[in-house]
Regions:
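Extended accessory regions or peripheral subdomains of proteins
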Residues: 1-34, 39-67, 101, 105-205
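Donor-binding/catalytic cores of nucleotide-activated saccharide
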Residues: 61-96, 102-108
């Protein structure tokens, strides 16, 4: 793996051609809040890039109760802004995660569902200081390390180097081992929270 010359942050490391997005995701899967944005369609315009991120320095969730979740997140995002290195994959660190369908209740007045079967948050967003990005056209992969949440230039550069090395060691040491398999699901077990009659009533049956 070779360092790409940079005079400023983010720190950029070009990855070995042997590492693709799926392999990197598998190797980092045990880290907290691992995220895989996979472009399954390898297309110059619609599916050029894939991204893997993990172990965010901050993580936010908000309940799907109609509260203004986005405005609560915006001030945190504004603290961590960086110039994008040109001619490389565009997501080089920052906010990424889940925006659920129920986030719409933060934007307009719509009735709440009678039952919340899955109890998903309105949003679950990580602030990622390390992102691994893959360009499917050029066949290149890169590690971006921003050094956040440090804001002092010297401390930020120090953290960026330390975090880059941490991830590179993780990629080198774990081989092709995966995390523990998920437990089996008993599909025969009933999981409905309401009665059958209420279910039919809710569905208009």
């Amino acid at each position: 793996m070779k360092d790409r010359e940079n005079k400023s942050l983010p720190l950029v490391v070009e990855l070995s051609p042997a590492l693709d997005a799926v392999t990197v995701f598998q190797k980092l899967s045990a880290l907290p809040h691992v995220l895989f944005l996979d472009s399954a369609l390898k297309d110059d315009h619609l599916g050029r890039y894939s991204f893997v991120a993990a172990d965010p320095f901050a993580y936010f969730t908000a309940p799907a109760d109609g509260s203004d979740a986005l405005s609560q997140l915006a001030p945190q995002m504004a603290k961590f802004v960086s110039e994008t290195v040109p001619d490389l994959p565009p997501f080089q660190g920052g906010a990424a995660g889940l925006l659920s369908y129920d986030l719409g209740r933060s934007l307009e007045r719509v009735p709440r569902p009678r039952y919340d079967e899955f109890e998903l948050p309105a949003l679950a967003i990580g602030l990622y200081d390390v992102v691994l990005a893959f360009d499917h056209v050029s066949g290149s992969g890169y590690l971006f390390s921003q050094g956040w949440p440090e804001t002092d230039p010297a401390l930020r550069a120090e953290r960026a180097a330390r975090r880059a090395n941490q991830f590179l060691r993780q990629l080198d040491s774990f081989g092709n081992r995966h995390g523990p398999p998920a437990g089996a699901v008993d599909f025969a077990r009933r999981t409905c929270r309401g009665s059958h009659g209420n279910y039919l009533l809710n569905k208009g049956g």
